[in-house]
């Protein structure tokens, strides 16, 4: 038994929708219609929006000393992370000869320092 396969019509590539096609004027108006009432309610009732009460209890307060000891400025974890960044940056530079990888550890170290300061460690 012989089966013959045939294609009906001309095969044309299917045009994919662009990522930016989602950002149409109509979609932006729909988004604004959904967001503006919520923003107005949060503006008039900030206590409900933030769910902050004066009688709240910090359940994670007992772990602050442990976190500061593990991830603080003088901890060994931060030193090992920086050392790993330097080694990975050096190896990636040797493999690709791209200076971005070599200087990347300095940029990541700055981000870590700023992040630690923001968090309070």
Swiss-Prot record:
Main location: membrane
Keyword Transit peptide: no
Modified positions (N-acetylalanine) in chain numbering: 52
Residues passing through the membrane, by range: 76-96, 101-121
Phenotype for residue 111 to V: No effect on propilin synthesis. No effect on pilus formation. Inability to support R17 phage eclipse. Reduced DNA transfer
Protein's membrane topology: Multi-pass membrane protein
Gene knockout outcome: Loss of sensitivity to toxin CdiA-CT.
Result after altering residue 98 to A: No effect on propilin synthesis. No effect on pilus formation
Compartment(s) where it occurs, according to its Swiss-Prot or TrEMBL record: Cell inner membrane; Secreted
Pfam families: TraA
Any one Gene Ontology cellular component term annotated for this protein: plasma membrane
Top-level taxon of origin: Bacteria
Subunit structure: Monomer. Interacts with itself to form filaments; also interacts with TraQ.
Protein name: Pilin
